Regions:
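Short beta-strand->loop
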Residues: 46-48, 120-130, 139-140, 159-193, 204-208, 241, 245-256, ...
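Ligand-binding pocket segment of bilobal, Venus flytrap-like solute-binding proteins
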Residues: 186-253, 261
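C-terminal motif of bacterial Sec signal peptides marking the signal peptidase cleavage site
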Residues: 19-22
C-alpha cells in the first residue's frame, strides 16, 4: 500500500454537488459508459512544495467556474505538496494523482517513463508551462555578507542553504542557475567554460551547510535563523516579504528562468473518471484569470521570457540583466544526463570535490 510521506498534505475537501457532467462529457480517451455518474467527482493534485497558497486560490476559482458551467456540480480537490522530484517518484510508484504541478520538466518525465502520462504534454498551451520565476538569493536584512553575485557565495565562512537535488526540483534549478551564469561568462572572475562552472559550484557547495528535502523546508529553515543566504525561487521570497517576513531578495545579474509545468496524469485521471475535469483544470491555468492569480497571489513572472525579464514594478519584481532558460545552455536532456547532473557532470564532480 502506498504511504504518504510526512511532507504530503491533503486539503481543500469541499462536499456538495449534483451532476455527473464530468463523465458524461468524457473525452474520446474515455469509452462511453465506462464512468458511472458522480455526484461530487474527486480530483487529486500532487504539487511541489512552494505553491500551496497559490494553488488554493486557483482551485477555488476553477471550482466556481466549473460549478456554474455544469449545473451546480461541485468538484472536490485532494492536494499533496512536497519536493518536486519526490512527488514525481511517488506518483510513478503509485500515488494516485490525476494532475501534477512540478518544478521542472525532468520530473514530469519520471512519470512518463512509468507509463502514466501517455500524451505529449508539451503541446499544451505555453508548452505546458504555467508559471515562471527566476532563481535568487534570500539574505539577512541589510545583506551583511554583501552577497550580490554567484561568486560571492564562495567567500570563506559563508553559510548557504539550498535543497537536496535528489528530492527537490528547486535545488536543480539553483545549480543550473549558477552553472549557466558561469558558462555564459556572467560571473566575475570565473572562466566561461565547463571547468570554470564546475569550480564555481565546488566553491559554493563547500559553503552549503544544510540541504533540506524541499525548497519550502529550506526557506523555513532560513527563516528560523539558520544560514546567511538561501538560494531559492524569487516568488517564494516575495511571498514571504508580502507576509511580513524579514527576508530580503538579491537578484543576481545573471540567473535562470524557472519554468514550472502542470500536467494531466492521463492514465490515472481516466481510471478515476475525472479526465475531462483534469484537462479542464490544466487548460484553465493558462487563462488570463489564472495567470493573474499566479502573478498577484504567487508572485510569479509572466510566462513569456521577454516579459519576465522586464519584471513587474507593482509586484516589486526587478528587471533581470541576463535571464536565460535551460534551452540557452543545452536543454534539460543534456543538463540531466551529461553536462551537469550526469556521472561526470559539473555538479556531480563539484559535490565530490566539496565533500572531499
Amino acid at each position: 500500500m502506498f504511504r504518504y510521506s510526512k511532507r504530503l498534505m491533503t486539503a481543500l475537501l469541499v462536499l456538495v454537488g449534483l451532476t455527473a457532467a464530468a463523465c458524461s462529457t468524457a473525452s474520446s480517451a474515455t469509452t462511453a459508459g465506462a464512468c458511472p455518474p458522480q455526484k461530487s467527482p474527486v480530483v487529486t493534485l500532487a504539487a511541489y512544495s512552494t505553491v500551496y497558497d497559490v494553488y488554493g486560490k486557483l482551485i477555488s476559482a476553477f471550482q466556481d467556474q466549473w460549478k456554474q458551467a455544469h449545473g451546480g456540480q461541485q468538484v472536490i480537490f485532494q492536494t499533496s505538496f512536497g519536493g518536486s522530484t519526490t512527488q514525481a517518484q511517488n506518483v510513478a510508484s503509485g500515488f494516485p494523482a490525476d494532475i501534477v504541478a512540478l518544478s521542472l520538466a525532468p520530473d514530469v518525465e519520471i512519470i512518463q517513463k512509468a507509463g502514466l502520462i501517455t500524451h505529449d504534454w508539451t503541446t499544451d498551451p505555453d508548452g505546458g508551462i504555467v508559471a515562471t520565476t527566476p532563481v535568487v538569493f534570500d539574505v539577512r536584512p541589510g545583506n551583511p555578507k554583501h552577497v550580490v553575485d554567484w561568486n560571492d557565495l564562495t567567500q570563506a565562512g559563508l553559510q548557504i542553504l539550498t535543497p537536496d537535488p535528489s528530492q527537490s526540483g528547486g535545488a536543480k534549478w539553483n545549480i543550473v542557475a549558477a552553472y549557466g551564469a558561469s558558462l555564459r561568462g556572467k560571473v566575475p572572475g570565473t572562466p566561461a567554460t565547463t571547468s570554470g562552472a564546475q569550480a564555481l559550484l565546488t566553491g559554493i557547495f563547500k559553503n552549503v551547510t544544510v540541504m533540506d528535502k524541499s525548497a519550502n523546508d529550506s526557506l523555513k529553515n532560513f527563516q528560523s535563523g539558520n544560514g546567511d543566504v538561501a538560494v531559492t525561487y524569487e516568488n517564494q521570497v516575495l511571498t514571504a516579504i508580502a507576509g511580513g517576513k524579514s527576508d530580503q531578495e538579491v537578484l543576481p545579474p545573471s540567473t535562470v528562468l524557472i519554468q514550472t509545468p502542470t500536467v494531466v496524469v492521463d492514465r490515472n485521471a481516466r481510471k478515476h473518471c475525472v479526465l475531462p475535469i483534469a484537462n479542464a483544470f490544466v487548460q484553465f491555468l493558462h487563462t488570463p484569470d489564472a495567470q493573474t492569480i499566479f502573478q498577484t497571489v504567487g508572485y510569479f513572472r509572466p510566462i513569456d521570457p521577454a516579459q519576465a525579464q522586464k519584471g513587474i514594478a507593482d509586484l516589486k519584481q526587478q528587471p533581470v540583466q541576463d535571464l536565460f532558460t535551460t534551452d540557452d545552455i543545452g536543454g534539460w536532456d543534456q543538463l540531466v544526463n551529461t553536462t551537469v547532473f550526469g556521472p561526470n557532470g559539473a555538479f556531480t564532480q563539484a559535490l565530490k570535490a566539496a565533500k572531499g
